[in-house]
Amino acid sequence: PHLEAIGAGTQDFMGNNTIALPDKKEVMEVNPYYADSGLWSVFSFRFLTGKPFTQADVDAGLPVAVLSESLAKRIFASTDVVGKYFTFIGKEFRVCGIVQDVSNATPDTAGDLWIPLFLYSWVSRTFEGEKLIGNVHIYMLAPTPADKEALRAEVQDVFRKYNLQTSEYENDLMQQPDDFWKSTFRKNSCEAPDWGELLKGLIYILLALLFIPAMNLSGMISSRM
């Protein structure tokens, strides 16, 4: 009752991410985003043509893709390309939709193309038999701000119960789930942020920004005297 939508996604910064048209040798570097169908419900994407891939596509690992407007124009010189094909990670992908470009100012959703999550090889791997996977971000949308604490408690309770079934490893959420703004400060998945140190750092930056104009102003006053 405290969850409106949930989605998962991750970017691949390690692979050789190039695409090509089936009938051409020229390749282009791209920034792929691997996602499940829930991502379309959590975040707002503006579809220019076509539609997003479905959860059935994700579960089956079908080679379908949503392209950004810019990438569609780079590859096909048009955005009216639903149903056309291109080659990526050794597979022939069919274009199912085109979305308006997503700004890099929102890196959690930005990409040149979005493809089904289970096509990412790291997602399908397990760790020491405990079925633990990493490098996938889960995004949850609560109906109201008042539901967030209840949703956070429910997630933590699910992991507590899951840990009762594991024999060797224990999952530690490190105080997650975070509010979205807090998640931008989480740089290491293996430890919780030190909010005290982060706050001190921000205060030092603020004081420095205030001190520099003060120095400039005092210099102007001295020169006039």
Stretches found by the model and what they are:
Residues E191-M225:
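Hydrophobic alpha-helical transmembrane segments of multi-pass inner-membrane transport and secretion
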Residues H2-A5, D80:
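Glycine-centered tight turns that cap/initiate beta-strands
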Residues D23, Q55, E130-L132, T184-F185, ...:
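Short hydrophobic/aromatic segments of transmembrane alpha-helices and their interfaces
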Residues E26, A146-D147, E197-K200:
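Membrane-helix interface segments
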Residues E4-G38, P52-A65, S103, F180-T184:
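Short acidic/polar micro-motifs at solvent-exposed secondary-structure junctions
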Residues S44, V58, F76, I221-R224:
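Short, function-defining helix-loop hinge/capping sites that tune catalysis or transport
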Residues D36-P52, P63-P193:
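Mid-to-C-terminal secondary-structure elements
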